[in-house]
Design a protein with these regions (language model features):
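Hydrophobic helical membrane-anchoring modules
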Residues: 198-200, 204-227
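Conserved SAM-binding loop
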Residues: 22-23, 48, 101, 207
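A short, N-terminal amphipathic alpha-helix
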Residues: 29-45, 62
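N-terminal nucleotide-binding beta1-loop-alpha1 segment
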Residues: 1-17
Length: 227
């Protein structure tokens, strides 16, 4: 099968400055995703989409191909769908069976995870169009509700003091791996639904670098033997 990996990496960040290339244990954050993709030896192309020449240089240094974004896709209003649509419709010079989206903020997602996800997807590719990596949710959905403008808890109408987990588990996307057939994704514009498979990852490997606390935890995990 013909497959590509896409790693989106816009420059700047509202939280951590230049988050996608911030140093994590001696390597820029994006390097972890590039190296994991290349180590699988499963992709025809490993592509970094960026608006920054500096990011492009780093990506190429670690072995990725680069697609520079146009001005319309270089601001914080550009969605993931818009970036992927541009690549799939306008930039790709060949047909593919599917693509794998790897967010650069998941440094503990390894080549083993990617390979397992691909194997699972391909084993059921006749019946599914998407795959999304998931983790067990920290809180069941019944425990998560908005707080009203008047700061009351009127949306929390369960007796939480007597709450016990039900027999089923709740899961949430961890942002590490998304797989899709191009036509299905362009039509649906997201990765979820009845035609999407799940790939479960543990909490440790699911860490997503969004703020300084996430970065510190990732450093601790990388430098330790915590499983």
């Amino acid at each position: 099968m013909k497959r590509i990996a896409i790693i989106p990496a816009r420059s700047g960040s509202k939280g951590l400055k230049d988050k996608n290339i911030i140093d994590l244990c001696g390597k820029p954050l994006i390097a972890y995703s590039i190296e994991a993709a290349l180590e699988t030896n499963l992709f025809d192309h490993v592509i970094v989409s960026t608006d920054s020449e500096h990011y492009a240089e780093i990506a190429q240094q670690y072995g990725a191909e680069v697609m520079m974004r146009g001005e319309a896709l270089s601001n914080d209003k550009a969605t993931t769908f818009m970036v992927l649509e541009d690549i799939l419709k306008n930039r790709l010079q060949e047909s593919i069976d599917y693509f794998v989206l790897l967010q650069p903020t998941s440094p503990l997602r390894t080549s083993k995870h990617i390979t397992e996800a691909i194997e699972k997807f391909e084993s059921k590719i006749e019946h599914f169009d998407f795959l999304v990596s998931m983790k067990e949710a920290e809180h069941a959905k019944v425990l998560v509700n908005p707080i009203d403008d008047d700061e009351s808890l009127k949306y929390f109408d369960t007796d939480f003091s007597n709450y016990r987990r039900q027999g089923y588990k709740d899961y949430s996307p961890n942002g590490a791996i998304f797989i899709a057939k191009p036509d299905s994704y362009l039509e649906q514009k997201h990765f979820f639904g009845a035609k999407a498979l799940s790939y479960i990852m543990n909490d440790k490997d699911s860490i997503d670098i969004d703020g300084i606390l996430d970065l510190l935890v990732a450093k601790l995990l990388i430098n330790s033997d915590i499983e």
